[in-house]
Amino acid sequence: AKGVSVQVNMGSPDEPDMIERLGMVTQDSHYLNCPVLGMIYPRGENLNVMENDDTKAVAHAARLAFELGCTVVKTKWTGSIESFKKVTSCVPIPVLIAGGPASSSTKETLEIVHQSIQAGGGGVCMGRQVFSHENPNAMVSALKAIVHDNANVEQAMRDFGL
């Protein structure tokens, strides 16, 4: 395998089992020198009261991934550069953002990605924002330009016809 991903829903009734499973997977993966993507989301009816603060909850999710041995973490965007800096600064591993709401426009999605990179984010891990896009190849190219080539949103949209 080139890598492994494991999801934990903080606040879910199954959270303890998910955390235990993530720990076991990371232990085995480290032995095999295989990177682990922890997809950690603060959501669920049992979410700790402290975690009702979205930024603290996402920072806690990132820290949980790091402490359990993940190589990289995927979590949700907190809504601003300032708040996401609090997340990226609490761990020494790359913090990737998920794709966000299905209703987001191309420009909104690219703006979120650009802001996350400005806040120290490590990139993106997206599904529907790419696969459901009318031009998935152009969307991937625009995302790459923003994440890896320091393009701004307008430049990426113009260069790839979005």
State what each model feature region is.
Residues G44, H133-E134:
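Surface-exposed loop/turn and secondary-structure junction residues enriched for glycine/proline
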